[in-house]
């Protein structure tokens, strides 16, 4: 029987060999954390390699994602569908083993990690989801949700500010099933961290309210084993296990230095490591005995079967709850969703209201949350401004309301967004979280990660323009809406009234293949009249709101607008119409969605031969030339805003009927 060290060495040499073959990568972290991983994965981790999507599996997140060969080695050795050939294709085009772990490639990878600090933050989201789902569905004697979230992280993760946001909240919420392993090796890319990272990490996390187990020898399996047992015994606080490790452990000449952090060791050093660790096997060769001891398939199948029996007993005792649990973990919408949500939209169209779109958003939440118990909302300390609370909101606390449906994220925009991604990845919830659009900047990378991972995170942004007014340019978005539109696989909506707002929310809920950004105003907006056909076309991202004649070839001019500027476009069209100009107005609440429509529909809205076009949006002007062409005009922002009442600002920056008409006449 192989020793624990030999089992860990299998990770080390797979990592060394794969990085060497790829001619790039990070061998140091996998070599340094191999002993910790061996104990966690073989003694504690509840998982089934034959079914990576088992609902009650433990979640493992590698926050220091540059050490990706660690998780790839673990998945391969324990029996997931990740072959030795897949490891040989590390970092190659279209492989299952990209340079950083990516969700949806290798089975068993729970989240995409790489930008440091986001993995630990995703892990907080996973742990919130587990605890909340457990309190919503578990009943005495029927614990169908009962799993841990384990996360590996390094110095870089703890230096990133997002780790403070996430770990502070995790302590406040008492996430007792979150267990983090800190790879305390004192090395980062630039060298020994003494010159730039001297925090007392133990005191830092104790101040957050975490249970901290310090000074664990990360190469001593007995100490690691005991630390995990202690961590599992503490059920009211998250645990940080501080593991003293040697980066590149086993490399005689490069261990404990930054030389092994982010580059192949080299053939000579790998040969020296083989001799040092007494590993007599060829590259990518693992003895059958070691494979047998690592294989977790049988153990995992037994564990899942036992859970299925528990679920069957639960279904017998609580059939309605069991059906609801199954629906939610399968990410299926309620049977009445389509009809009820459409009825709500039609009701709004039939009952006009001139309200701020942020208020329209709250009304949509109120209507939809009653249909969607999986909604898990929140705001970054701006609930009264973002209007994200509804009549059934139940804020989650560490002990009280652990079965709630709303998270007070505090002033943590980046943390909130990455936590939402963890909640979405976990399953059972549709997370939404809000802040001012300007503060999206703090969270931009987490929004991008949601899009990359194709997760249904709903990012709500209010106070969307200079319409914010007196708070001034520090709080007035200019380029933010366009920046969001440029993120691949993110659908960005900027609705013009309560109807478009409700449609945007509906589209976001129904979109399973990616996130949405929902952008709303502070100021009131007039509701637009629509025919049934126009109402149906709102969901297509852009549509003709004002026709000038039956024949689509007839317009002299097309005005394109979004959000608060749609009303302005309609008023300008009335003035031009009175002067004999045939004007079509296109409302385009989502350029992303409109661009995905078939060519015939896009041509019906924006006929290519009608080149006289003006776009109107209280955001950066440059974005709109893709629609109006170089000969067109854009009424938009080309500078930062000012501190003044909103009506004065709109006039100052040219968002007036007179200016829109003047711009139109320049090209007529």
Swiss-Prot record:
Residue numbers annotated as active site: 413 (proton donor)
The protein's enzyme class: transferase
UniProt-annotated binding residues for substrate: 26, 261, 358, 385, 463, 471, 522
Pfam families found in the cross-reference section: Transket_pyr, Transketolase_C_1, Transketolase_N
Assigned keywords, A-Z: Calcium, Magnesium, Metal-binding, Thiamine pyrophosphate, Transferase
EC code: 2.2.1.1
GO-annotated molecular function: metal ion binding; transketolase activity
Annotated positions binding Mg(2+): 155, 185, 187
Marked site (Important for catalytic activity) residue numbers: 26, 261
Cofactor note: Binds 1 Mg(2+) ion per subunit. Can also utilize other divalent metal cations, such as Ca(2+), Mn(2+) and Co(2+).
PROSITE patterns given in the database record: TRANSKETOLASE_1, TRANSKETOLASE_2
Catalytic activity: D-sedoheptulose 7-phosphate + D-glyceraldehyde 3-phosphate = aldehydo-D-ribose 5-phosphate + D-xylulose 5-phosphate
GO BP terms in the entry: pentose-phosphate shunt
GO cellular component, one term: cytosol
Assembly: Homodimer.
The protein, known as: Transketolase 2
Organism per entry: Pasteurella multocida (strain Pm70)
């Amino acid at each position: 029987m192989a020793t624990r060290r030999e089992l860990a060495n299998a990770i080390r040499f797979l990592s060394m060999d794969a990085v060497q073959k790829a001619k790039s990568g990070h061998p140091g972290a996998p070599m340094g954390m191999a002993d910790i991983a061996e104990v966690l994965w073989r003694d504690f981790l509840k998982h089934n390699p034959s079914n990576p999507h088992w609902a009650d599996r433990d979640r493992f997140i590698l926050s220091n994602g540059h050490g990706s060969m660690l998780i790839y080695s673990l998945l391969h050795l324990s029996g997931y569908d990740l072959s030795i050939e897949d490891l040989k294709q590390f970092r190659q085009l279209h492989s299952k083993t990209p340079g950083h772990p990516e969700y949806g490639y290798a089975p068993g990878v729970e989240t995409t990690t790489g930008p440091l600090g986001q993995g630990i933050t995703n892990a907080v989201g996973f742990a919130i989801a587990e605890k909340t789902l457990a309190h919503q569905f578990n009943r005495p004697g029927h614990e169908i949700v009962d799993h841990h979230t384990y996360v590996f992280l390094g110095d870089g993760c703890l230096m990133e500010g997002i780790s403070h946001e996430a770990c502070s909240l995790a302590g406040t919420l008492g996430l007792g099933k979150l267990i983090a392993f800190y790879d305390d090796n004192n090395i980062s890319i630039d060298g020994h961290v003494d010159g730039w990272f001297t925090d007392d990490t133990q005191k830092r996390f104790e101040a957050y309210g975490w249970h901290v187990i310090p000074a664990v020898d990360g190469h001593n399996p007995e100490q690691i084993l005991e630390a995990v047992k202690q961590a599992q015994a503490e059920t009211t606080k998250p645990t940080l296990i501080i593991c003293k490790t040697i980066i590149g452990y086993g490399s005689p000449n490069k261990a404990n230095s930054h030389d092994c952090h982010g580059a192949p060791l080299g053939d000579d050093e790998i040969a020296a490591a083989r001799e040092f660790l007494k590993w007599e096997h060829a590259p990518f060769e693992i003895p059958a005995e070691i494979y047998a001891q690592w294989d977790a398939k049988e153990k995992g199948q037994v564990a899942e079967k036992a859970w299925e029996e528990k679920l069957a007993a639960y279904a017998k005792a609580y059939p309605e709850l069991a059906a609801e649990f199954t629906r939610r973990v399968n990410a299926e919408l309620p049977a009445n969703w389509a009809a009820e949500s459409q009825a709500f939209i039609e009701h709004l169209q039939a009952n006009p209201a001139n309200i701020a779109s942020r208020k329209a958003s709250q009304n949509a939440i109120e209507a939809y949350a009653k249909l969607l118990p999986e909604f898990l909302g929140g705001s970054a300390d701006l609930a009264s401004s973002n209007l994200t609370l509804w009549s059934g909101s139940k804020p989650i606390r560490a002990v009280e309301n652990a079965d709630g449906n709303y998270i007070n994220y505090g002033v943590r925009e980046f943390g909130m967004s990455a936590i939402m991604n963890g909640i979405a990845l976990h399953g059972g919830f549709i997370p939404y979280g809000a802040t001012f659009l300007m503060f999206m900047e703090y969270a931009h990378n987490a929004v991008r990660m949601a899009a990359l991972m194709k997760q249904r995170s709903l990012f709500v942004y209010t106070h969307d323009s200079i319409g914010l007014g007196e708070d001034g340019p520090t709080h007035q978005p200019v380029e933010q809406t366009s920046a969001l539109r440029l993120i691949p696989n993110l659908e960005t909506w900027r609705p013009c009234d309560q109807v478009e707002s409700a449609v945007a929310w509906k589209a976001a809920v129904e979109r399973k293949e990616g996130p949405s950004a929902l952008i709303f105003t502070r100021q009131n907006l007039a509701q637009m009249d629509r025919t049934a056909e126009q109402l149906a076309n709102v969901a297509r991202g852009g549509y003709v709101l004002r026709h000038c004649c039956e024949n689509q070839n007839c317009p002299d001019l097309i005005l394109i607008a979004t959000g608060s500027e749609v009303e302005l476009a309609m008023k300008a069209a009335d003035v031009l119409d009175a002067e004999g100009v045939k004007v079509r107005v296109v409302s385009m609440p989502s350029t992303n969605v409109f661009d995905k429509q078939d060519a015939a529909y896009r041509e019906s809205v924006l006929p290519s031969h009608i080149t006289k076009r003006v776009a109107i949006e209280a955001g950066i002007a440059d974005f709109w030339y893709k629609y109006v062409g170089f000969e067109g005009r854009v009424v938009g922002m080309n500078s930062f805003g000012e501190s003044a009442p909103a009506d004065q600002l709109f006039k100052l920056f040219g968002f007036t009927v007179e200016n829109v008409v003047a711009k139109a006449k320049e090209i007529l």
